[in-house]
């Protein structure tokens, strides 16, 4: 089976699952709703703007994590992965194809959520200026698809390693919401090194220009390169482990 055929097969599998449309539909609905609500009800003392619009995509990131990890664990639970394995004798080609499709789909969702969030906010609060007006705001808006693609592949890799839907989602959420903030708050406890900026999700936040986070050494764009490298390494480990578990 050619690489193109592998990609087409992965797309077909996703389209054939009712859960795909439901999960992505719920993600879009929740994200766009949050964008509209946030821009109408900004935090006390703050003026509504693009940062409120991006509340929706920021929350949607966690739903994309669930979707991407489930795309891996569901196949092992239902056994459809073995049908694909018969057609594609290489775990590397098969899983790289899956990762590629998931990344593209997540990026497309990012485009929809970012553009849709601005559109919904413009309707919900027409007197609020939500159009990006500077370099930082444009970066905050345009990095949404990239961030969702990276998070999706990282979540897929964790799902391949654990194979359990519940365990994978738990690990991802605890990692992003508990472990990284806790380690960042402890400061330079590890041999005098502040490890907070080196946490993947925190580094990704710096790339996106989110306020209140940590600054990655070398700047936000290097942070993106770092997160991409971590994601690629984790995916490579997941593929290697899968090849050893079931050659």
Protein language model regions, located:
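Short, Lys/Arg-rich, polar N-terminal cytosolic tail immediately upstream
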Residues: 1-11
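Secretory targeting signals
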Residues: 5, 18-70, 95-163, 174-185, ...
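Helix-capping/transition residues at the boundaries of transmembrane alpha-helices
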Residues: 13, 73, 84-86, 155, ...
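Transmembrane helix boundary and interhelical loop/hinge segments in multi-pass membrane proteins
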Residues: 47-49, 68-87
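Short coil/turn motifs that cap or connect alpha-helices
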Residues: 90-91
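A cytosolic-side transmembrane-helix exit/cap motif
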Residues: 102, 186-195
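Membrane-interface capping segments at transmembrane-helix boundaries
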Residues: 237-247
């Amino acid at each position: 089976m050619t690489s193109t055929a592998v990609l087409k097969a992965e797309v077909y599998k996703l389209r054939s699952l009712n859960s795909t449309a439901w999960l992505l539909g719920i993600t879009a609905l929740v994200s766009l709703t949050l964008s509209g609500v946030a821009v109408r009800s900004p935090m006390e003392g703050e003026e509504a703007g693009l940062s409120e619009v991006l509340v929706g995509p920021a929350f949607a990131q966690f739903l994309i994590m669930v979707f991407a990890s489930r795309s891996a664990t569901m196949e092992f639970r239902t056994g459809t992965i073995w049908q694909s394995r018969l057609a594609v004798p290489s775990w590397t080609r098969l899983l790289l194809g899956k990762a590629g499709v998931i990344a593209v789909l997540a990026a497309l969702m990012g485009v929809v959520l970012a553009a849709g969030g601005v559109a919904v906010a413009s309707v919900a609060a027409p007197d609020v200026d939500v159009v990006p007006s500077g370099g930082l705001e444009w970066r905050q808006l345009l990095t949404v698809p990239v961030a969702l693609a990276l998070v999706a592949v990282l979540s897929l890799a964790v799902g391949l390693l654990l194979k359990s839907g519940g365990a994978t989602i738990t690990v991802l959420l605890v990692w992003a919401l508990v472990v990284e903030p806790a380690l960042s708050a402890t400061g330079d406890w590890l041999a005098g090194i502040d490890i907070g900026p080196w946490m993947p999700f925190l580094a990704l936040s710096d790339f996106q220009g989110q306020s209140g986070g940590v600054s990655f050494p070398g700047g936000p764009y290097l942070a993106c390169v770092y997160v991409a490298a971590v994601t690629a390494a984790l995916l490579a480990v997941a593929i290697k482990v899968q090849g050893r578990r079931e050659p």
